[in-house]
Amino acid sequence: MKYYWFIFCKTDLLLEKVGNNYTIPLSEEPPIALRPWTHVMNIGPTEDGTEVKAFMIDSPVTDNPNYEMCGLRPSFYLLSTELYLKAGKCHELLYWDQNTKFCGVCGAPMKMHTDISKRCTNCAKEVWPQLATAIIVLVHKGDEVLLVHARNFKSDFFGLVAGFVETGE
């Protein structure tokens, strides 16, 4: 069975070059060697039923001409919408996995309980990925739209007004 392999080094995603296009590696085995301690996460399948796996690597792949590392945001311009959205989900779950290795109650190691939950090996506390509710607002006047440009944007990229919603708002 072939899997899509979403492989991240920090926030950079491994892309496979196919002619003049880019995609996520699709193969039976991971396209790069796994370390013994690498945790491979099972992520929900794509719309066509192809299974998805994701993991983190410590250093970027630079020695293989078939692959290129690309930031998650810039990959929007290189991947299909479905694969880009799946990449975002994979990164979210890998970040959660990296930051929930130990129980917040007793400090014992956490172990995967389901594909998206962990259980403490000592006190049985369960944790799931947290939701960070955010809003995006379209401010318009007639045919004009208010767009914002943050200083940390790397190009002439503009977006709608957005922010996080606090509990009770």
What are these regions (language model features)?
Residues 159-169:
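The catalytic Nudix box helix
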Residues 42, 54, 102, 136-138, ...:
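Conserved hydrophobic/aromatic beta-strand scaffold that supports enzyme active sites
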Residues 1-81:
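N-terminal alpha-helical interaction blocks
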Residues 114, 121-160:
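N-terminal strand-loop-strand
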Residues 59, 152-153, 165:
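Residue-level signature for short turns and capping positions that connect secondary-structure elements
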Residues 87-135:
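Acidic, metal-coordinating catalytic segment for phosphate/diphosphate chemistry
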Residues 41-46, 118-120, 139:
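Short acidic-hydrophobic surface loop/beta-edge motif
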